Amino acid sequence: MNREPNAQLISLMAEAEVSNKGLAKRMRDLAQQRGMELGTTHVAIQRWRDGAGIRSQAAGVMADVFSAKLGRRIAAGDLGLFGQAEASTPQPVAYPAALSEALSVLDGLTEEQPQSTSSSELAIPDTDLSAAVLSWMIARPDGVQADRPSPQRASMRDVHAIRTATEMFMRLDFLYGGGHGHKALRHYFRDDVLPLLNASYTERVGHALFTVAAETAEVIGWMAYDIGNHALANRYLLSALRLTQVTGDRMFGASILANLSHQANYLGHTSRAVQLARSAVEGAKGSSATPRAKAMYAAHEARALSSAHDLTGASRAMNEAERHFEKADAAEDPEWLAYFNEAELIGEFSHCFRDLKRPVESLRFAKQAVAKTDPQYARTLGFCRIVLAQSHLLNGDLDRAIGTASQAVEEGESLQSARFLRYVTDFQGEISTHAGLPVVTRFNEQVAEAVASLDE
């Protein structure tokens, strides 16, 4: 059968300045980030240019590749592909204007595999992220559609159940890392949470439902971040940000921006981290954000500025965080903010001084962070111990540095956390100049054994 060439696809490829081989590689890479297997080759691209049909999954990936490359939303239906009856699961390349689209995006995300695809790549291009933040900043609350016709009726009992489940998964995350529970929470969110958002409910129940749904989506995103699947985490967090617009929850929305800053900073995207942290600070102004929340936003700004080696800016942000924290009252705070205690703030400061290469301050704060961190936050304690080890190294004490790091590895053996492993490997890199010493050799062997035990 003769086919007409696909003029739309040919035009998009020309605009994006991408070859058949280049487009095929971008599609394979993006699919791999999402835990999908896609065997697209340049031969397949040519067939599609010639007018052949395509599977919806491949069409969705191709559309998102063009969206990222061109800096605007490209849907699968825009590709001109024969046999493409409908677009595949939408991805939050841009900030969804309609709530229905945001919920569709989240439903699609829950179908993606949670396996680690560790990479420094983020799913949302800078242009789309800036547009998303601006949209959130200026948006008016969507509001909830109370008492609409639906075969399902939601109540506050459902809200309490979701919050209890989410808190349980948060505890698992703190104790064992994001690798524990991510898949189960993803399925719970898909099967038990998202359907309730389309149920019938009162104004009060609807408000509470969207609030707890945003919190749950944020936890799933954070788990994906900890596993090392940064593209998936990026999209979950941005989708959670969109849910906060329903109720106008600026305090929690700003905390999601702070978490996006945390992720960008971890991946070395320093400018992006600074902008997101400042967006959190500014976005929460005029809201009901508590002093503890404001301290958290400022602490994330300090972390980003420290990575940028901006001593003046980081010092200002740390002082601001400390000033807000002094006014914190647990009775005013939402439950999701309970983790941000004195130990957490001190731990953030220890990271700041480590990145600013301030040996004395880094050591002082790292010691305090280790002493004050509750062992139930096993991953956080592991981070703090590695920062303490790095602080000893900054002060020229190799033996104490390795002894402290060794304890962190021993206590963190059960952690399924790509972030914790990254802390350890970063430390290994810092002591590599002493590779000939027996103490370094023994530590490297300990790390290798600990990593191997995770696969047993």
Task: Show where each model-derived region lies.
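Short amphipathic recognition helices of helix-turn-helix/homeodomain-type DNA-binding modules
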Residues: 1-26, 38-138, 142, 148, ...
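Short amphipathic alpha-helical interaction patches enriched in hydrophobic/aromatic residues
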Residues: 13, 31, 49-52, 173, ...
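Generic anion/oxyanion-binding catalytic loop in active/binding sites
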Residues: 12-13, 34, 51, 205, ...
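Amphipathic alpha-helical scaffolds
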Residues: 31-38
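Conserved binding/catalytic microenvironments
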Residues: 149-159, 163-456
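Charged, solvent-exposed alpha-helical segments that act as regulatory interaction surfaces
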Residues: 36, 71-75, 327-330, 414
